[in-house]
């Protein structure tokens, strides 16, 4: 898994080591290419749960990478590492490529780019981490450098990135 080359091509496909997993592709074709997924709820998980696919009528509807910066899979989108790049850097590229409506109603934790059907999610935001540091100090229990570093990593790198069929985020 670790050395896989994964490229996200919005509104079209994900390339996994050159193997195309296309939006709208039949589940049987996907699983012939990358193996059988593990069904949990309505999602199928692949590559040790680092990638999930939602199917609609047995066709790929949404693909999500769930592992963030510490995961095995390192997808790229528009030539940028989705998880290793700074969250703000990727956010600017996605805004530019989307060139339209963005759902950003979760106070910086997630963004849904409607024109390119891409969504990203953070586990923390820098402002919340700063508040957490101040509160911990205020309660007489300051955070350690390791704890601060961990929280800042969560605030500065996307935890998930997903792509859906055209119109996915307008539903």
Where are these regions (language model features)?
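Short helix/turn-capping signatures at newly exposed starts of structured segments
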Residues: 1-171
